[in-house]
Amino acid sequence: MSIDKSYCGFIAIVGRPNVGKSTLLNKLLGQKISITSRKAQTTRHRIVGIHTEGAYQAIYVDTPGLHMEEKRAINRLMNKAASSSIGDVELVIFVVEGTRWTPDDEMVLNKLREGKAPVILAVNKVDNVQEKADLLPHLQFLASQMNFLDIVPISAETGLNVDTIAAIVRKHLPEATHHFPEDYITDRSQRFMASEIIREKLMRFLGAELPYSVTVEIERFVSNERGGYDINGLILVEREGQKKMVIGNKGAKIKTIGIEARKDMQEMFEAPVHLELWVKVKSGWADDERALRSLGYVDDL
């Protein structure tokens, strides 16, 4: 009697903030898991995305953007999380942006040179490169930086060449039993996913006005007799002015955020959702490691 082989392994997605790591993860999974927004540093937790296809299970670690400034407690912890997820993986996908190369990219590259895992270089947003003639010399420059397993020009947004990345990932998964059931997309709890969805809407509708020092706590997440969920979310900001900004004129902003978040939650949980949101000022939390621990920022460090 032959036993079918199965393959399973961990893959880290790394890169400086805002190069499209979360968008790439969502494309690889075929579902929106990691919080995506134009604002740098929006992925604060090591969300694990799981993609199972037949005998192959790829477990993705979506790291926070490694970046140079480490002044505040929250940023120190985020960089620590990003570095720790590089260590214990079969494969690393290093995402860079078009023909841009910055000191932050250099810093990530230096960390990767120290590691043992093979690295795929995903050159994202190639569809946005204005001067196509610049692309080839830039790819040659990148190729000279490190012995990459492969260099793949992609557009995470449109899906261009994402299947190529997925094929390379499959090829490098070691023979192993699957860690998760076939229908798992992420090992994070629904409560965590609810807070991520609210945070994404905050980023989307407040954009550059909103500092990173905003977080969401899910105070209540219960099933109701209608077969859905009652969810209460608490939005924590550092200053009274930020509270006014989140609430908006006559509550218009928080209403929009609530409506959009509820739609996404219903789609993700496949059930009706009753969502209530509050905004509260909790000053200085981004500099207080104890507060960060209580908010779950250091659960995986």
From Swiss-Prot:
Protein name: GTPase Era
Induction of the gene: Expression increases as the growth rate increases. Encoded in the rnc-era-recO operon.
UniProt record similarity statement: Belongs to the TRAFAC class TrmE-Era-EngA-EngB-Septin-like GTPase superfamily. Era GTPase family.
Function in brief: An essential GTPase that binds both GDP and GTP, with nucleotide exchange occurring on the order of seconds whereas hydrolysis occurs on the order of minutes. Plays a role in numerous processes, including cell cycle regulation, energy metabolism, as a chaperone for 16S rRNA processing and 30S ribosomal subunit biogenesis. One of at least 4 proteins (Era, RbfA, RimM and RsgA/YjeQ) that assist in the late assembly stage of the 30S ribosomal subunit. Its presence in the 30S subunit may prevent translation initiation.
Tree of life domain: Bacteria
Compartments where located: Cytoplasm; Cell inner membrane
Example of a GO biological process term: protein phosphorylation
S-S pairs: none
KH type-2 domain span: 206-283
Region (G1): 15-22
Lineage: Bacteria, Pseudomonadati, Pseudomonadota, Gammaproteobacteria, Enterobacterales
Region of interest: G3: 62-65
Keywords from the UniProt entry: Cell inner membrane, Cell membrane, Cytoplasm, GTP-binding, Membrane, Nucleotide-binding, Phosphoprotein, Ribosome biogenesis, RNA-binding, rRNA-binding
Gene3D superfamilies: 3.30.300.20, P-loop containing nucleotide triphosphate hydrolases
Note in the entry: When overexpressed partially suppresses the slow growth and decreased 70S ribosome phenotype of an rsgA knockout; RsgA may be involved in 30S ribosomal subunit biogenesis. When overexpressed partially suppresses the 30S ribosomal subunit assembly defects and cold-sensitivity of an rbfA knockout; an era mutant missing residues 39-49 fully suppresses these phenotypes. Overexpression is not able to suppress a rimM disruption phenotype nor a C23U mutation in 16S rRNA. Also suppresses temperature-sensitive mutations in DNA primase.
Gene encoding the protein: era
Entry GO terms, CC: cytoplasm; cytosol; plasma membrane
Record annotation: effect of changing residue 17 to R: In era1; suppresses a number of temperature-sensitive mutations affecting cell cycle
Keyword Cytoplasm annotated: yes
Disruption phenotype: Lethality. In the presence of 1% protein cells grow extremely slowly and are blocked at the predivisional two-cell stage of the cell cycle. In the absence of Era and Rnc there is an additional defect in chromosome partitioning. In depletion experiments cells grow normally for 2 hours when protein levels fall. After 4 hours 16S rRNA levels decrease with a concomitant rise in the 17S precursor rRNA molecule (extra sequences at both the 5' and 3' end compared to mature 16S rRNA) and a loss of 70S ribosome assembly.
GO MF, any single term: guanosine tetraphosphate binding
In-chain residues carrying the UniProt-annotated modification Phosphothreonine: 36
